[in-house]
Amino acid sequence: MRATLAEALGIRVSLLQSGMGGVAGPDLACAVSEAGAAGCLGGYKLVGEALSAALKRLVAGTDRAVGVNFIPEVVGPEELDRQVTQVLDETPRQVYLSLFGMPDDAVCERITGAGRQLVVQIGTVRDGVRAAEQGAIVVVQGTEAGGHLLGTSHRDELVAELRALLPDACLVAAGGIGSPAEAARAVAAGADGVLLGTAFVVARESMAHPYFKTAVCASDEADTVITDVYEIGWSGRRHRVLATAVTRDCDQPKKFIGRTVVEGKQYVVPRFSAAVPTVTTSGRIEEMAMYCGLSCGAISGERPAADIVAEFARILPGSGTVGTENVEESHGKL
């Protein structure tokens, strides 16, 4: 039987926060979950002590449904196995696993077999069907999305096509959703909830660099481009970013343009790096990868994550009056 996202995850608002690497730390994920939606930690390449530290903060910050996102194609099967093992061993069952891109079936089976909810983001019909067959909540990404693109279809077209094939699956629309009106369009196309990424880049709890946040708020969809230039650390995947001097001239030398700190360790940032500028990044921020979707035109300024959740609460399926009250109560506590 078809369930809304709220029913599938045991949350009050049918909304997922994207587990954006570098940007979505424990503070953002917990704030979203405490507001009644489902927050998500950007696990990205974290493993070992660094991942354990982030998981401890995540679990300490909320006892509600909250996720950890990993990227199979970036880390490879062995590292992904280590990451999944840590989450299963070190967190309670309300922590769900989110995967960006369709992994091997064995990975899905391991997660669901452990009694954890699985969320898989896809960009093609084939992967959407595979994810649903594995019992996953299926995040349907359109090319309107910021960040790395998993397919070539527009959001609502892909949602509608998958809904026709998967009448009982829980489908979550992603890409270009910056307003309740846009969320309503996605629901009308057949979605059971929505995922927001760019909208949470500018959340007060986000770890995005202030320059990045300001640039998103000052932009509209014409300021974004789909490119493949930010390929160091994640090659072979097109991505939507804010246009920069680097996207306009990709023949510049691959020299270091900044530094950043991840879980206490300092790293240099080369030009064309896939890494986003965070609050710990210094250097030529304006040349770095600032992932941004077509929703930016509806985003006007930094605000608490709870305010973002509250804005969408009344329009999303499965939320209802109870969900709205919960969001307002949570906001009052922040």
Tell what function each PLM region has.
Residues 1-170:
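Active-site entrance/lid segments in N-terminal catalytic domains of soluble metabolic enzymes
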Residues 121, 175-176:
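Conserved acidic functional residues
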